[in-house]
A protein has these predicted regions:
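N-terminal ligand-binding lobe of clamshell/alpha-beta domains
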Residues: 1-165
Length: 165
């Protein structure tokens, strides 16, 4: 992502390059560590929800999809031509993801999980591999995306471990 470059540019404009360079380097190092941990592991088919009514997701060009890839997940809708496609239940059932990531449409994690319980025929719902992420941490290209990425990586690792049992 272009977050490190943005940090460096803002620091340059503000005359604080030493601070922004350190922040950008720290960000890059944390991203590299997350990638290292997921490297070589089985990809987890993942559905990314950004809204539940109507059901909306993201394709592979969205930053949330990049985070899922970083964590060793595979966005089941990555190849769709629209950045934020509407999804019918049939398409979701066909994709049958092993993990569901989201949180943008829910007031709370409990509500997010409750809404998904209506779709018990989806593998991720059956296996309880539904992971809520604070939308402020994952839906914007800022350094805070690392907070969301860490949660997603933990969730996908849990789904991966469950799949090999």
């Amino acid at each position: 992502a272009g977050i490190p470059a943005l940090l460096r540019n803002v620091g340059l404009l503000a005359g604080k390059s030493n601070i922004s360079d350190a922040a950008a380097t720290k960000f890059e190092n944390e991203v590299q560590e997350l990638a290292r941990i997921a490297q070589g592991k089985t990809l987890v088919p993942t559905f990314i929800e950004i809204w539940h009514d109507p059901l909306l997701s993201v394709n592979g060009e969205h930053i949330m999809s990049e985070v899922v890839s970083l964590c060793g997940g595979k966005n089941v809708l990555a190849n769709l031509p629209i950045l934020t496609p509407g999804i019918g239940l049939e398409a979701l059932l066909e994709a049958n993801p092993s993990a569901i990531i989201g949180g943008g449409s829910a007031v709370s994690e409990a509500e997010f999980r409750r809404v998904w319980q209506r779709h018990r025929s989806v593998n991720a719902v059956q296996q309880r591999m539904i992971f809520y992420v604070n939308p402020d941490w994952i839906q914007r290209a800022t350094p805070r995306i690392l907070l969301g990425a860490k949660g997603i990586c933990e969730g996908l690792e849990k789904a991966r471990r469950y799949a090999v049992q």
